[in-house]
């Protein structure tokens, strides 16, 4: 409990979970009403709960534009997922192929920016629901249920938006950062984009999972496919997929065994089981930020209870589930490590560079423009948080006791963790700079602050060049210029002293990063091309 309070000191995650549960319960009530009035099968209710549970989490970062997009994308995806579920039952090969294409495509479109990434996330939600309904549960309602699935998905978006809006207006949850803050614009990179690599990895993992699952467990292949998807889908790097695979296997095993121990306690169609399912989903949503293992354990327990609710004994399927989970995790891990792998070091270097770019924007911004300064500060904080997510696997691996590996010469790379710690220590001075820039006596006009800003900005740029292994522009010798008169600096006000101290602290932390990345490569100085400066041996011939 003490660790839990540390990970959620202001209970912000718990508050967001409460909003998510309200979204789930409202959508659940609507789906029950539609099921009764339209004569649909209970699988429509399961799909509605799965979509609303996932949407309640991903929509935390949505702004107004994202919600308008969700009103179009999610209903269409829900209708497509409903038809795909029937296709998989009647034409498995074609259905499996379309499922793989849909999942891989939702990852591939991330290359088109933030909006496309969030739209791709919405596409995944109904496809995930296809894997949740227990095998052998026939879908009812014909094509009519496709339209009702779209209506229910639209209700989930509208209801979730209203609940979230009310929670934000009352201060129950934080407002998400603007798109201008979370958008990462960087130079075009050569090679295969990360989104394409991840899409191919996911496609290979899902294809292998379908083949193995259908051949080994024809009635319960979904466990293998679902695990392969969960391990591969959000993996940022090889280290991330390794940790996720381990947590998924461990957590799912614990969840399956716990659910198996209570199997039969509620009976088919038990209302008590429904209450337990929603309670466990709430705990899973809250503790996911603490560890993915809690999420995996709780969600697997929910799926086991769902099988029990449908009358399929979870105790009889214990070994099948554990085997399917282990195989799915292994397939996801193998695909991420062998198919165009994304190195963890490359991810951490790239995210460090984007964080430094945001810091440079703050240092070079017009301090008379308070909005621009605050936006640059928000981008820096957000990108440091993204770096923290990328280094989570390294932090865990560094904490593991691996004496035999160390005897063989392997040591965990703690460099990215030191870089993250240094950038996090910069957040305090950055906040003080924002306060100083908003003061009535703006220190931007003070020559001492201007010199310090220029020096720190140059330090930041040098680090970015070192990370990208790009040489600095060669220095061209120039004729000496006569010294210019420098206007004397005024008295040091409290604001100026605070700004100078903050810049000095940032520069000191940048020295820590220089120790990790080194100096940028140097380019040979170039001399202005004059006829007399060209050696005789290399002058062009008249022949």
Predicted regions and their residues:
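Long, hydrophobic alpha-helical segments that serve as membrane-spanning/inserting helices
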Residues: 1-39, 59, 110-114, 141-153, ...
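Secondary-structure capping and boundary motifs in well-ordered enzyme cores
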Residues: 76, 250, 254, 294, ...
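Short, hydrophobic/amphipathic alpha-helical patches that form generic packing surfaces
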Residues: 125-129, 428, 432, 505
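Generic detector of multi-pass transmembrane helix bundles and their immediately adjacent loops
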Residues: 274-278, 293-380, 384
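Long, intrinsically disordered, low-complexity regulatory segments adjacent to structured domains
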Residues: 384, 420-423, 427
